[in-house]
């Protein structure tokens, strides 16, 4: 048996003893040599004791108790500590570039929009200040997207308890529409169609949803066959806003490219399952669909493999000619003397005139063309002006390099080094990039850009007011 923590109180020594198998308070009178059990606790041991002017303080069962040796009373103490808790007060926090997520651009690239700490922020390309359009610590606003006509912004908010789609004016001062999604969960990567009528996005259960922004009606366009930590089933709208393109896992765990017609619900498989195809992007003309494909992906299909090394992957760049009436943009060229004909006036089509996307299903896979660049570790594509495509190459020790291929020049150019994220505006004239802690907006024309071009300097001066206690209510 143990006897510990002796303290003097009056003419007696008080101590903890576990002679009856549970640590209780005992006393010893030196003048008589008598020992006495003072407490008869049966649930928890006494851990520590100390003596004060009014009795013995002891810790037991997670509480402090005061024992009066004269009366034998044991009183549980209620202790309230009013701390400063400055970290729980409302405060202004700096916006860190590394914490800006879900980036998007306004239609013409005049402002960038982000999610930050459950708020939606916009920043100007050059002139002006950053803007918090939500100011809601008590709810989380996520995944903003700007409408192609420029006057609306959509995002997901859990202010009702479940995530809903909120559509506001671009200043965030007026909620135009609130759309409830059936079977609410967590939603990802919204994309607004060019005709302003629909928004496509995915959910936790790997469904592609399409929401009518006018009526609020929603439907599931397709569902991925298997769960995978890399969410590659991200819908991309055709230039006319009538189709979406997306990769989908097949039985062999390779991904194939599909397109879905919103009006009819028709699905067309663009690529077979003999290669792993990702990152579909429509050409601005609507005639071609670019994508990346790998024929050496097989050893990487088991993503839960606990081995230390993954097999290296290479991908090649392809395009599919969608309409059988269109010819390949990469047909052999031959310089010939041009015969001058009588001049006729033709009305030039502007890039804003979105021609209808026509897809001829018959023979489609035979109209897939390999673009003449070496197979490398390409990780994604991004839209570009007509007959051009951005592609990203991951290079060991150099990071991700952004490059651009031009179907007219038939060669790639280095565009921007060391990029982490790339977003293209609706008009395909502006590019938002992140390189480390630098965000910038630059033009999609030309080549040889460098990190720092078009830097969003207003981020460094932006502060957001947060209410930590309201945030905790939302989080927990």
Which positions does each model-derived feature cover?
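Long hydrophobic segments that form regular secondary structure
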Residues: 5-10, 113, 363-413
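Blade-terminus and WD-like Trp-Asp/Gly-His loop motifs, strongest in beta-propeller folds
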Residues: 5-12, 48-54, 104-110, 144-152, ...
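Conserved blade-ending motifs and adjacent loop-strand segments that build the rim/top face
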Residues: 2-3, 36-50, 268-279, 378-379, ...
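Predominantly a core beta-strand signature of beta-propeller blades
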Residues: 33-37, 72-76, 129-131, 173-178, ...
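A flexible loop/linker signature enriched in serine peptidases of the S9 family
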Residues: 1-4, 16-26, 40-47, 57-73, ...
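Intrinsically disordered, Ser/Thr/Pro/Gly-rich linkers and terminal tails that flank
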Residues: 369, 396-476
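A short helix->beta-strand "capping" segment at the edge of beta-propeller domains
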Residues: 83-100, 357-374
